[in-house]
Amino acid sequence: MATKKKMLQAAAGNAGGGAGGLDVESVFSTYLYTGNDASKTITNGIDLDGEGGLVWIKQRDGSTQRHVLYDTERGTSKTLSTDRADAEFTSTTRVTSFNSDGFDLGSSSQVNGDPSNYASWTFRKAPKFCDIVTYTGDGNDNRTVNHNLGSSPGMVIVKKTDAADSWIVWHRSVPTGYLSLNVTSGLQNYTSRIKSANDTTFTLGTSGQTNSSGANYVAYVFAHNDGDGEFGPDGDADIIKCGSYTGNESSFPIIDLGFEPQFLMIKSATSAEDWLFMDTMRGWLTDGNNPNGDFKVLRPNTANGDGGSFGVNITSTGFELTSASADKNSNGNTFIYMAIRRGTKVPESATEVFDVDTRTSGLPSFKAPFAVDMGLVRKGTNTSGATYNANRLTGTKFLYTYTTDAEANDSGFVWDFMDGWANDGVANSTVISWMWKRAPKYFDVVAYSGDSYSNRDVTHNLTVKPELVITKKRNSSGNWEVAAKITNTNYHGGLLNSSGSLVNTSLNVSGNAYSQFSDNHFQVGGTLNSSGDTYIAYLFASLDGISKVGSYTADGSAQNIDCGFTSGARFVLIKRTDTGGNWFVLDTVRGIVSGNDPLLELNSTSAEDNGYDNMDPYSAGFTITAYGGTSPYLNISGGEYIFYAIA
């Protein structure tokens, strides 16, 4: 962010104002749901009633229902379809209400058929993000239409609403022509539709597709943030980018957005190819390079449902092309895109970002009040068995926490649920999942590929310095490398898949794995940066009242561990560091009680041990009970321990 902007924000803060801006979660949502042939309320946190916006819906599992658009300027009863040039039509059974936290649906199969699955994307009107304008054409050249973005648009989409005509798209990267959203055609080099755009207006030509005298139009105006975004906790984040790249089938393009995206639209401006929608809720992955289709795309110019695609990887700073594909990366062709940042909201309660559940009937298999980004699963706590680790970025791939094995596949590890994760078998109370949602200052997930350089910087989006980092090679054998912060300048290093001690003098564990941590990157080398290998890293931080990474020295007597919580810890991970000791997991679903507490070990396949009273509830955190025959693990006098706790 520019120095002048920082100074202005600081001045506003000192004067009693706030430097914070709107979070992504307040202005954009991808929300998936299953229809019910009746009425349905979609609660996605977007204030459409008070602020206005656009709702875009598509059936995912069929090709009979089109992309349909509704906005607060035209009203709930007016439907437009992007794969057709048709005029809007009136219906009272599709979107029936715009609410302060989402929208309501009627019984139409176009938006709510039972048991069809649907995707919805909601764009709230907000400066420097999105605006919606309706206007009546006058047929005059250089007609200007006002908008309220407060910045120059990145993309403008115009549709005549009272008669049939093509959807017209103007994009800042190809400003001398237009594209049509309802067809595959490449750029048409004519300026008679939309001629230009600035921070207050866009200018029309004389074409009837955008400016026929007496005709009615709607324009969806999307911003492009270029270091001038005013979003996120500090009011300085860019959240939407409209840009372009040139296809290269041998040296694949890497697009640096300055943020990790959750939504991406791509279109070839050179040749006749489909428009593509991909998002992380429907399975856009970090290594979608399988020609059989690793992730799902929807195509606004067709009525087709989710189709397999490949060749676009998410990165922590943008996206990269990984294959030669005519619709994404054909040699020399120009491709335009619009990308929207993943969430920026700092959680206010631990229940927003962490939960524990046993496997239940119905879908998803593990329920949570949020869309899960990372899960640990223990399949059978009462018998010996493995703990599985999976995450949204790598899809159905999983790793065992107790071994060095490469990742494998479980088709039941799916993530397209708003309230949990997995389609993984029948109800079983001995199968348990610990579930995390990514959020700034709390938890982040980073997938990266090695390049063999020492002290290689890997960007993360935790926004604070991580206090616990766990990284594993994915594509072949490799240890789970751990670094845990003990003091401001000292980390302990070790292995999650081992009971061995953690080294407390250097980060240079197992081949100089880690070398530095900051609020936006960590440095790796050696075993965590082999050329051509793929890795997954989990980053954890202490967040007041929500999570705590800490340490304690045991003295054998009962000890209260103050984490700054108010209702006790629901999850605790503990490891002795000065000598051998297992990675123990306790949680309130299995029991943190004034009595025996079941212990599971991430570094082994042992059945849970419920023969000892190791921990008692404590409102500010947890209590380590006195050492003895009933508590032999977590309080050995003189022992040094690290822990990670969640309220």
Show which residues each predicted segment covers.
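Surface-exposed molecular-recognition determinants
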Residues: 2-647
